[in-house]
Regions:
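A short, exposed helix-loop element centered on a Lys and neighboring polar residues
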Residues: 1-13
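Structured, solvent-exposed acidic/aromatic patches
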Residues: 16-70, 74-302
Length: 302
C-alpha cells in the first residue's frame, strides 16, 4: 500500500519499478496525501470519537484508555513522518488549527501513554473483538495493552535520545528508567506482539501479503511491464568492482524469458534499469540506438 511505497522511496536509484517517476527523485504528492488522510481521518478519528463520547462513562474506562493508547501510536507515526502536527487541537472539525512542535508532541505522548497504561484495570471492561491485542476469546488483553503502551514509550525515548538541539537525552533517560522500574509491564517475547488479521491474500480482501512478492511473483505476468528491478546507479557502483553484494541485491539477465521462451543475448550478465512506467523506454523523445545493450533488454531482464 501507500506506506510501503513511502518506505521504498528511500531506495531511489537502487530500486526501479512499479510505476511513475519513482526512480527520478520526483515528488509523489498523492501518495503522501493518502497516507496522511488514512492515518489522520480513518485511524485517528474513530479512536478520538471513542474518547470524546465515552470518556465520562466509567463503564467504558478501559476501552477509552485503549483508544488513547492507539491514538498515541498513530500520532507517533504521523509525527515521525511530518514533524509538527495538530496534537492538542486537531480532530475537532476546525478549519484552522494550531500545530504543536515535534519535540512537544513527544513530551505529550510520554505523558498520555503513561496515564492511559496506568489507568487500565486488569478486571475492567474490554472490547469483545479486539483487532490488535486479543486473548484466546478475541477480547482485549489488558496486560498486552499495558505492555504495548510502555514499550512504545521506550521506542519514542530512543527517538529523542540524540544530544540537543536534535534531542533530549536527559528526558529520554528519565523515561527509560521509569518504564524499566517494572520490566514485567514491557513487551519481552513474541507472544506480546500484535497479531492482526486483515483478510485474504489480495488487496481487495485486505490481504496482509508482502507487496513485492505479490506484485513480482504472484502476479508476475499481469505486471510484466512494470516489474521491480535493480537500479542502474546501484548496479554500476558495484559491477566494476565485482562487489559480492551484487548477487544478493540483483539478478542477472534470465536464461529464458517466461513470456515467450526466447534466450536473451546477454543471459547471465548484470544490468541496472532506468525504466519508467510501461517497461524500458527511457525518457520521452529519447531513442535508444540498436547497439545500446538496453535496446535488446526487456523488463524481465533486470
Amino acid at each position: 500500500g501507500d506506506l510501503n511505497r513511502v518506505v521504498t522511496f528511500n531506495y531511489t536509484q537502487m530500486f526501479v519499478g512499479f510505476q511513475g517517476r519513482f526512480q527520478r527523485y520526483s515528488e509523489e504528492p498523492s501518495t503522501l496525501i493518502n497516507y496522511w488522510r488514512n492515518a489522520y481521518v480513518q485511524c485517528l478519528m474513530p479512536a478520538h470519537d471513542i474518547i470524546r463520547i465515552y470518556e465520562s462513562n466509567p463503564e467504558f474506562s478501559n476501552r477509552v484508555n485503549i483508544a488513547k493508547i492507539w491514538k498515541c501510536y498513530v500520532l507517533s507515526q504521523i509525527a515521525a513522518v511530518w514533524g509538527p502536527i495538530p496534537y492538542e487541537y486537531g480532530l475537532n472539525g476546525d478549519i484552522i488549527v494550531n500545530y504543536n512542535r515535534e519535540q512537544d508532541v513527544y513530551y505529550m505522548l510520554f505523558d498520555d501513554l503513561k496515564s492511559a497504561a496506568t489507568a487500565l484495570d486488569m478486571e475492567g471492561d474490554v472490547f469483545t473483538k479486539d483487532p490488535i491485542f486479543a486473548d484466546t476469546s478475541g477480547k482485549s488483553d489488558i496486560l498486552k495493552w499495558k505492555k504495548f503502551a510502555n514499550t512504545l514509550r521506550l521506542r519514542l525515548a530512543m527517538r529523542i535520545s540524540n544530544p540537543a538541539p536534535d534531542g533530549d537525552p536527559v528526558k529520554a533517560q528519565a523515561v527509560v528508567e521509569d518504564v524499566f522500574s517494572d520490566e514485567n509491564l514491557t513487551m519481552a517475547s513474541d507472544d506480546d506482539t500484535a497479531l492482526s488479521h486483515w483478510g485474504g491474500l489480495i488487496s481487495a480482501e485486505g490481504g496482509d501479503y508482502n507487496p513485492l512478492y505479490y506484485y513480482a511473483v504472484y502476479e508476475k505476468q499481469k505486471n510484466i511491464g512494470t516489474l521491480p528491478a535493480f537500479g542502474e546507479t546501484a548496479c554500476y557502483h558495484m559491477k566494476p568492482y565485482s562487489d559480492p553484494r551484487l548477487k544478493v541485491y540483483a539478478q542477472p539477465v534470465v536464461d529464458k524469458k517466461d513470456s515467450d521462451g526466447t534466450v536473451p543475448v546477454h543471459a547471465g550478465e548484470y544490468f541496472g534499469d532506468t525504466a519508467s512506467y510501461g517497461g524500458y523506454g527511457g525518457e520521452s523523445g529519447v531513442t535508444i540506438p540498436g547497439d545500446n545493450v538496453h535496446s535488446k533488454l526487456t523488463r524481465e531482464d533486470y
